């Protein structure tokens, strides 16, 4: 068992998560079993109640864990499934230690940061290593070196290396380029490594973020002041797509350095060759409008972005995302006029819902390919009730408790639930698909397992009415009680799901409903242009299998 710890310095947002994921991908593609841990120094127990504007998307795992979006990157890059235990927060650590103290586990001792907090951190890391059976566990430490919140975690990791000797430290820093000559400045990296060394950690690898590739002179200067060999200075310059990063790091000599540090024979097979080629040189493009309320922060919908990137890598059809604020759509649907497809993602709260309903109506009435996810599924049901069934004012009780037509209502088991954190219908659930439906053709299966995150469902009292109006609920939960997929028979371009298919999308196995949406968008685009490309998307689909 070996550990690779990835820390960050100078500023946040340098891409530690993507670099950690890329290291994991390289090792996984070399036949090495990997797992990953994200350390988040915030006091929240998990990411479940966080505002997407502050923290980005809340990623949902198979076991129902609501975690940092970096775990989504780990799963996608390494093609592994993680659990809530792979996300360690200050809140989890302190709560466990306090509960042990209340239980009397410390036998009256004074409970302190060292050793009790640090011991709990190490215990959690070792438990992930044990249960995963991984050869290498990657550990990303959130924040930057010097942050007061991360100090106990860095101390625990220093102790981990002292106790086990099988820990590699990698540090991500910024090398800014200043002035008319764009001179690469190493001083921020020098000071960042100095801060790390002051707490007893000497990095073995430095990932230097910059706009342009580091010069050999810059690498030598960083090496001189940090005691990291030149071959351990890895230049990480900007790339057009994050899935091109692993090959860049390989070209920089990362495998040679890791092989020496881990004492492993690393033979990278690069399973993404054709995938990367499709990303670099797409053969066609479509515009997909994502209509949401957090569109100013694209990371709030990062799994949708990545799912579309996966479609591009498998089909060569690039997706240009139009980020549309749902509040603007309510009174002006013209903002959707250039879209080849519309996606309504998940969300909570009343703000922007009427705009999402308007966007759904626009798609239905203009034949624009449509995909609704979670709240988007519920919004589709509301739109059908209002504009097809004529139930004026139909709504979800989430937004209007006194609506005359509550076509979407709270789950029975959610009634009376007071706590917000970790109490929704969460995680992987069995979905049973009806034969002879669009959903069955898309998935090619009778049963699938998808991840959920919701408190509300289609009101059973309105199911027959909606189906008699020309729509069909083509999938349900295992008991046949909860509706999971809505489609319109005879219309290949309209589908909505209660589950979050984006959370299970992988580079070589893209979300099937996102893939279908892009196929339909391509047909719509060329039909609108007056061209006959009926067979084009089918060919693209076969390439994506």
From Swiss-Prot:
Which residues are CTP-binding?
A: 12, 147-149, 185-190, 221
Look up the domain of life of the source. Answer: Archaea
Task: Please list the residues that bind ATP.
Answer: 13-18, 70
| Location of region: Amidoligase domain | 1-264
Entry's SUPFAM superfamilies?
A: Class I glutamine amidotransferase-like, P-loop containing nucleoside triphosphate hydrolases
Q: Does the keyword Cytoplasm apply?
A: no
Residues binding L-glutamine are: 53, 347, 375-378, 398, 455
Q: Which residues form the Glutamine amidotransferase type-1 domain?
A: 294-527
What Pfam families does the annotation carry? Answer: CTP_synth_N, GATase
| Key words, A-Z | ATP-binding, Glutamine amidotransferase, Ligase, Magnesium, Metal-binding, Nucleotide-binding, Pyrimidine biosynthesis
Similarity section: Belongs to the CTP synthase family.
Outline what the protein does: Catalyzes the ATP-dependent amination of UTP to CTP with either L-glutamine or ammonia as the source of nitrogen. Regulates intracellular CTP levels through interactions with the four ribonucleotide triphosphates.
Question: Any idea what this protein is called?
Answer: CTP synthase
Q: Which organism is it from?
A: Thermoplasma acidophilum (strain ATCC 25905 / DSM 1728 / JCM 9062 / NBRC 15155 / AMRC-C165)
Gene coding for it: pyrG
